[in-house]
Regions:
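Transmembrane signal-anchor helices characteristic of membrane glycosylation enzymes that use polyprenol
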Residues: 2-29, 180, 201
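Transmembrane-helix motifs of polytopic, lipid-linked glycan transferases
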Residues: 10, 93-113, 151, 155
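Juxtamembrane segments of multi-pass membrane glycosylation machinery
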Residues: 67-97, 116, 131
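Short acidic/glycine- and proline-prone juxtamembrane loop motifs at membrane-interface regions
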Residues: 26-27, 131, 137-145
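Transmembrane-embedded, aromatic-rich helix segments that form part
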Residues: 186-201
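Short helix- or helix-capping micro-motifs
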Residues: 122-127, 134, 154, 177, ...
Length: 216
């Protein structure tokens, strides 16, 4: 049964990649491309470029837009003609890569919480969701928030439950919080319930230690 689900999951994922890389640009992708461009210019000029404010982009920190644009510039250096003629392909390649990594994170997290069967099924159901599938290549906001949320939850869970690699898990937890905030400033609101549950778990886990500390 697992082999059948994995085969189907792989097929749907390949279909998602093909769809993402062949579909054209959506209406708001131009905004995110320009948002990445002006912030990239600001970085490479060490703050001398001051034309980075346009429309309502003050509500979009632009970390992912800048990263996506920077990766595109690497391809531009390698093959200028290809980049100029396939800018939609390049942007969607970055987006679908992050979307696929979010599915991997969902699989790993669900496997930790439940088992392999449920992890495969959860990943497949997520991929089959038309809102997720259809946005894998062209959405530079919501699926990146999902990516940040899933990997934050995964490493925060490891930090709370495992006694090994505590520093590594804490650093990666913090990294994905920062990454999510770099996409949307409201990201802490999304992860707040998870953090509260984690703190309660940690308190109960080390409750005896706290009591001994207070007794001293």
């Amino acid at each position: 049964m697992n082999k059948i689900l994995l085969t189907f999951l792989s097929f749907v994922l390949l279909l998602a990649w093909w769809s993402s890389l062949t579909i054209g640009l959506s209406s708001d992708e131009y905004f995110h491309h320009i948002n990445g461009l002006v912030r990239f210019k600001y970085l490479i000029t060490l703050g001398e470029f001051d034309g980075y404010d346009f429309r309502n982009n003050e509500f979009y920190p632009g970390l992912y837009d800048t990263l996506s644009y920077a990766l595109g510039q690497i391809i531009l250096l390698i093959n200028k003609k290809f980049y100029a003629n396939n800018i939609d392909f390049v942007m969607h390649l970055v987006n679908v890569s992050f979307s696929s990594l979010s599915i991997l994170g969902l699989y790993l997290l669900t496997k930790k919480l439940f088992n392999t069967n449920i992890a495969i099924l959860a990943s497949l159901i997520t991929l089959l969701n038309p809102f997720f599938f259809g946005h894998m290549g062209m959405n530079s906001k919501d699926l990146i928030i999902f990516f940040s949320l899933i990997w934050f939850c995964y490493y925060f869970y490891l930090y709370c439950t495992e006694d090994e690699k505590i520093i590594k898990n804490l650093l990666l937890t913090s990294f994905f919080i920062g990454f999510g905030c770099g996409v949307r400033l409201t990201f802490p609101v999304v992860i707040f319930p998870v953090i509260v549950c984690g703190l309660i778990f940690l308190y109960k886990k080390y409750e005896a230690n706290y009591k001994n500390l207070f007794k001293r």
